[in-house]
């Protein structure tokens, strides 16, 4: 069953996000620290008539990395060519993409951490000095061909910055950490989406929905669609706080934005492991989820909300989690 609070795209959400996508930094809601930096760097590059330094955007799924890449290209007034790490299977794929770039273009590589190493190594000289050397032919007839490239800006997006090699990471002159959104910013995003799709929503309802959306615009917009459905069938179409609460409760999204999987993780840690510490691998097996899924999809929000802590000996449930789930808290828990 598809998880309503999944950070990744579901169904036709890609086309929906393109409809909602802001075009320029002034329209982009949230991520003020990243925006303020980019505004300066982009304007400086334009005044010097140079390509922008390469940009690395990292953070959890659904926080606007792809949107930011398109905004950067629009601000620069250049074309954006988009691909992804898994799609570039061999060196020839990357060479073809690079050879098709025009001066000043933006090349956006999503999930850049998933590129094969042989492909990644070609990027080094392309990023640093705008050229690539490739081997043509095989055996005794093989020869090296030197290709000059036009100046371009590479924007890499990743949910796992730690998996990037040091040589690749060092070639990004600009890094932007896309953080979870504040409730006020998410509220504005919810109201903007409602306006675009001609929904009627009370400000208090938008705030309540934003508060329970895990700091993630993608999740907020997804929940808004389901709340709209509920309001249409169970009410008069107006999205109120009461309607929002009832709809989210029906969807198993609690007051802290946790769903049944989040609660299962916390309850397992409390009931089976006495609050921890417990290793990530052991916990993943117990709840029948992949280790990477737990680490990338569930754990970041639980840590950000203060429900679990990482320690040297494993994950530990906090007093806040005990209180939220209604368990008595024992202060003798080891950390």
UniProtKB/Swiss-Prot annotation:
This is Holliday junction branch migration complex subunit RuvB. Mg(2+) binds at residue 66. Residues 1-181 are annotated as: Large ATPase domain (RuvB-L). One of its GO terms (cellular component) is Holliday junction resolvase complex. PANTHER family: HOLLIDAY JUNCTION BRANCH MIGRATION COMPLEX SUBUNIT RUVB, PTHR42848. It comes from the Bacteria. One of its GO terms (biological process) is DNA repair. Homohexamer. Forms an RuvA(8)-RuvB(12)-Holliday junction (HJ) complex. HJ DNA is sandwiched between 2 RuvA tetramers; dsDNA enters through RuvA and exits via RuvB. An RuvB hexamer assembles on each DNA strand where it exits the tetramer. Each RuvB hexamer is contacted by two RuvA subunits (via domain III) on 2 adjacent RuvB subunits; this complex drives branch migration. In the full resolvosome a probable DNA-RuvA(4)-RuvB(12)-RuvC(2) complex forms which resolves the HJ. It is an enzyme of class 3 (hydrolase). It catalyses: ATP + H2O = ADP + phosphate + H(+). Pfam families: AAA_lid_4 (PF17864), RuvB_C (PF05491), RuvB_N (PF05496). It is found in: Cytoplasm.
